[in-house]
Swiss-Prot record:
GO biological process per UniProt: glycolytic process
EC number: 5.4.2.-
Protein name: Probable phosphoglycerate mutase GpmB
Domain of life assignment: Bacteria
Organism this protein belongs to: Yersinia pestis
Length: 215
């Protein structure tokens, strides 16, 4: 049975400032760096064989810390990027106009066909996240990969694995450097395919985390 660990990146400057990130970027805060070290210590003896990260800076910074702890080299996969938030990227949440806030609400509430101008739909996000996860099936037998990605991206992936709509990710709280695990099982008596073993585990973090204020 293939086990795949999923980690959200550490807290960033824009998380703390309530600024929309999407596929724009900001570095980890000191808290975010500590979170990354803590999750690295959590997984370092789990037999991880591959560290695969979104190619955005905040995930690479997190993944590098984990890779160093595991004695591995990190590789990147752009399919693990966060949702493209289009014209709202790099905007403080409190600065959105009523029209822009309506775009955001339609997106997160699952309005059919919702998309922020110049951005990406939740359906498109789910499709590429599933493709990134499925590519783990091509790794050598005995592999145990760890993927480093983003809050909405991982929430969308986990929601849709359960057969829920992509926007159900609103109902999953995946805090910075939380740890999730999905397994691929083939069984004549259990559901075959991807199953969720755990989601949003923060037992390794030793400090209160910011809530996902931008969400």
């Amino acid at each position: 049975m293939l086990q795949v660990y999923l980690v959200r990146h550490g807290e960033t400057l824009w998380n703390a400032a309530r600024r929309i990130q999407g596929q724009s970027d900001s570095p980890l805060t000191e808290i975010g760096i500590r979170q990354a070290h803590l999750v690295a210590q959590r997984v370092r003896n789990q037999g991880i064989t591959h560290i695969i990260s979104s190619d955005l800076g905040r995930t690479q910074q997190t993944a590098k810390i984990i890779a160093d702890a595991c004695g591995l080299t990190m590789v990147t996969d752009p399919r693990l990027r966060e949702l493209n938030m289009g014209v709202l990227e790099n905007r403080p949440i409190d600065s959105l106009t009523p029209e822009e806030e309506q775009w955001r609400k339609q997106m997160v509430n699952g309005t059919e066909g919702a998309r922020i101008p110049e951005g990406e739909s939740m359906t498109e996000l789910g499709r590429r996240m599933h493709a990134a996860l499925d590519s783990c099936l091509e790794l050598p037998a005995g592999s145990k990969p760890l993927l480093v990605s983003h809050g909405m991206a991982l929430g969308c992936l986990l929601s849709t694995l359960l057969g829920l709509p992509a926007h159900a990710e609103r109902r999953l709280r995946l805090r910075n450097c939380s740890l999730s695990r999905v397994d691929y099982q083939e069984s004549p008596w259990l559901a075959s395919g991807w199953v969720i073993e755990s989601a949003g585990d923060t037992a390794h973090l030793d400090m209160p985390a910011l809530d996902e204020l931008q969400r």
